[in-house]
Amino acid sequence: MAKKIIGAAIAIGLLGGVSVFVWALTNNKVVIGYNQGYEPDQPIPFSHKLHAGQYKIDCKYCHTGVDKSRHASVPSLNVCMNCHIVVKTDSPWIKKVSEAFYADKPIAWEKVHLLPDHVKFNHASHIKAGKDCTVCHGNVQEMEKIKQVQSLSMGWCVNCHRQPENKAPLNCSTCHY
């Protein structure tokens, strides 16, 4: 009798766990890196609306190498200081950037666009294919605070890859390790 109860409890637990997992995947809930709407506070506020919007600074100026590399780098403080060595130097936030720069201490920015460990995303190939950064990242030039706009789920990516005009590969190894 006890074995039957234990067996039933295990079966119910497994069924419940699988059900929750499937529900979360199909509803784009925060699971294995799909964080649509994620908008973390950063150690130093940075306005893409000001920099990319008002000043029209191209994404590739700060995110150097994004057109040649698999990854879009978080800008080094050197990039910030190219302008802020003379611009808004009296701002308390710029003073923190400057202090970190001269102390050779990188700022611990919070990563916004998270992908599962088993997924690889090559920024360079997407840029070479003519995809604008806004396709995946949204209209950052209108964002005071950066957030993840798209789900970045497998289904979302595959929908784009399946568009005939994109001529994008559909084999699993393109995106998965």
PLM features: residue spans?
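Positively charged n-region of N-terminal signal peptides that target proteins for export
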Residues: M1-I6
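Aromatic-capped interface at the extracytoplasmic side
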Residues: V22-P40
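Sequence context surrounding c-type heme c attachment/ligation sites in exported
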Residues: D41-W93, V119-Y177
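Alpha-helix-centered segments that form part of catalytic cores
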Residues: D104-I127
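General zinc-binding finger modules coordinated by cysteine/histidine
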Residues: A100-Y102
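Hydrophobic membrane-insertion alpha-helices, especially the h-region
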Residues: A8-L25
